[in-house]
A protein has these predicted regions:
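Basic, helix-initiating cap at the start of DNA-binding domains
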Residues: 1-26
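Cytosolic nucleotide-binding catalytic cores of signal-transduction proteins
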Residues: 2, 24-26, 39, 128, ...
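HTH DNA-binding helix-turn interface
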Residues: 2-3, 23-28, 41-59
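Append "Primarily bacterial transcriptional regulators
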Residues: 15, 34-39, 47
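Short, basic, alpha-helical segments at the C-terminal edge of helix-turn-helix-like DNA-binding modules
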Residues: 32-33, 62-74
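Hydrophobic alpha-helical connector segments
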Residues: 71-102
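Amphipathic alpha-helical packing segments from all-alpha helical-bundle domains
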Residues: 102-148, 172-175
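C-terminal peripheral helix-coil segments that are non-catalytic and often amphipathic
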Residues: 153-180
Length: 180
């Protein structure tokens, strides 16, 4: 499938927009390909020419609603992840995430996306530490999510500066210096 073809781009865009709208209304696990196709006026066979399943479409939505990984400072991402997150995420992804907070299917794809996002950020970076990039990405993403869940579960409202400070206290971020 030629992703540069105007028809392909339009079809993908309408499916992404339809999924975004659906995610603001109902849990991802309840969204069906059939309903998406009916709303988007796209044949199911056409959907499956472009996407393996609805999780594949969701992954594309995440790509559209996040800044390119090459625009993100790795040093800042490691030292101040909670200050970087608002720079990475575009509207309406934050609202969608809040709405989907309790949907395990959504959250699994969300975490997987951000794991891969961090891996892209770290692709051309050499760290002074011997910690594998895959482990670093996995740990940073999952701990970042844990901080947000901690706030939600305990009904706390901690500002990003304090969250960054907690993060730095809990993890030896100095050991993750980027080699220049």
């Amino acid at each position: 499938m030629n992703d540069q073809d105007l028809r392909v781009r339009k079809t993908k865009r309408v499916l992404q927009q339809t999924l975004q709208a659906a995610l603001l209304q109902e849990p991802f696990s309840k969204v069906t390909v059939k309903a998406l196709c009916e709303t988007a006026l796209v044949n199911r066979a056409t959907f499956y020419k472009h996407y393996h399943d609805k999780a594949d479409l969701l992954y594309d939505v995440f790509k559209e609603l996040t800044a390119n990984s090459d625009q993100i400072s790795v040093a800042e991402l490691i030292r101040q992840p909670f200050s970087v997150f608002p720079k990475v995420v575009k509207a309406p992804l934050s609202a969608i995430n809040v709405k989907q907070m309790d949907d395990a299917s959504f959250q699994w794809v969300f975490r997987q996306y951000f794991y891969n996002y961090y891996m892209e950020c770290f692709q051309d970076v050499t760290f002074k530490s011997d910690v594998p990039k895959a482990l670093l990405s996995y740990t940073l993403v999952n701990n970042g999510f844990s901080f947000f869940e901690w706030q939600r579960d305990f009904q706390l409202d901690v500002d990003e500066a304090r969250m960054n400070a907690y993060f730095q206290e809990l993890f030896n971020v100095d050991a993750l210096e980027v080699e220049e």
